[in-house]
Amino acid sequence: YTTLFRSVGFSGQMHGLVPLDRQGQPVRKAIIWCDARSVDEVEDIRRLLGNERLGEITCNQIAAGFQTASLLWMKKHEPALYEKTETVLLPKDYLRYRLTGCLSTDVTDAAGTLALNVRQAAWSDELIRTLGLRRSLYPKIYLPQDFAGEVTAAASAETGLKAGTKVFHGGADQVMQAIGNGIIAPGQ
């Protein structure tokens, strides 16, 4: 059946942390959204930025398990792994990277990291700098419908998907669910 696919898009869980080294290999196991180890880092973020400023930048409430809080936890508790990290991805972005070699994210998933200036649809240099993180860790941001690449020969051998199959960025699970339910305009 995999030869019938003309393209692949992704919808995946938000907020997780998949840190990659220079060779694109994970430096540790992923920390997903429901992992609450970063509760102290959440308080650090609130202390450094304040809830009001954080809300102005991210349009989000903060919780343990969000990528930025998990990254701060890693920096504090696993400094050697943090230093080896060259790029941070979200879980679905890691899967797309494995299929295509494209290190990137989409704006809907980036909005759940607590590092995105949502109004500008760009990484918040202010937030990243204030928290003492490296801006270079964050990948390029695309729209969900943007082309990411094609399934590589290596990914084809692992998955059975035909090499050359087009892959699109896709989006965060809650956003894609809303679109699937027809919620596409204000007030719906």
Task: Please report, for each region that a protein language model flagged, where it lies by residue.
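Pocket-flanking alpha-helical
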Residues: 40-44, 177-179
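Short beta-strand scaffold segments in enzyme catalytic cores
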Residues: 16-19, 176-179
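Carbohydrate-associated surface elements
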Residues: 35
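Short, small-residue-biased leader/transition segments that mark boundaries at the very start
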Residues: 1-4
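Alpha-helix C-terminal capping segments
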Residues: 180-186
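Gly/Ser/Thr-rich active-site cleft segment
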Residues: 54-172
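Acidic/charged, solvent-exposed loop-and-adjacent secondary-structure segments enriched in E/D, K/R, S/T
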Residues: 8
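Short, small/polar residue-rich loop motifs at catalytic or cofactor-binding pockets
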Residues: 12-14
